[in-house]
Amino acid sequence: MNVNLKRSTIDPRMSRTLPFQRSPQATRARLGKAQLLPIPRAVADELALAAHMSLAALRSGSSDIAPARHITEAMYLAKFLAEAGHGDFSHDELLQADRTMGAVFDTGHACGSWSLPADDFDRLAAIVSLYDHQLRRASLGALSVASERLERFKAGEPYQPMQARKSAPL
């Protein structure tokens, strides 16, 4: 069956194109603009809650390595975001936190329980709080760059501090 529509039979109030039928350039521009916005609040809340729960698990002791891995990842993401201008996180603080987490992993592998010594809790709690704040403020683009950097670091690329940008107001 061949249907031949004349221009006069189409309602002019109807949309001529569907919203997703755009040129590749327009799609890239729209995606580029999305990179400038923060992630949705619900996503930020979920990620922050997971970090806080992992910290609580380490505080009370965990039979699973996952909370220690999660806190270590959050620690590096917070550092990478701070280097991009989202908060303050000194290199010395990173070194101290890294030593703390190294001890958590060593002890956990030796005895099967991953726990955070009480003396080190406040240091990591401050980092998790910074990460929580960064998730609510940093753009999707900054979070994507930090995540890509974390994946390269986990794959074996050595950590190299970026020239820190001036911190955005918190």
Annotated model-derived regions:
Residues 56-72, 109-126:
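Short, low-complexity cationic-aromatic patches
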Residues 70-103, 133-148:
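Extended intrinsically disordered, low-complexity coil regions enriched in Ser, Thr, Gly, Ala
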Residues 113-170:
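Amphipathic alpha-helical binding modules
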Residues 1-30:
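Arg/Lys-rich, low-complexity, intrinsically disordered N-terminal tails that contact nucleic acids
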Residues 30, 46, 50, 54, ...:
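Charge-rich, solvent-exposed alpha-helical interaction surfaces
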Residues 9, 49, 163-166:
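Intrinsically disordered, low-complexity segments enriched in glycine/proline and serine/threonine
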Residues 35-39, 86-89, 109-114:
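A ubiquitous short alpha-helical element
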Residues 19-84:
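Short terminal alpha-helical segments
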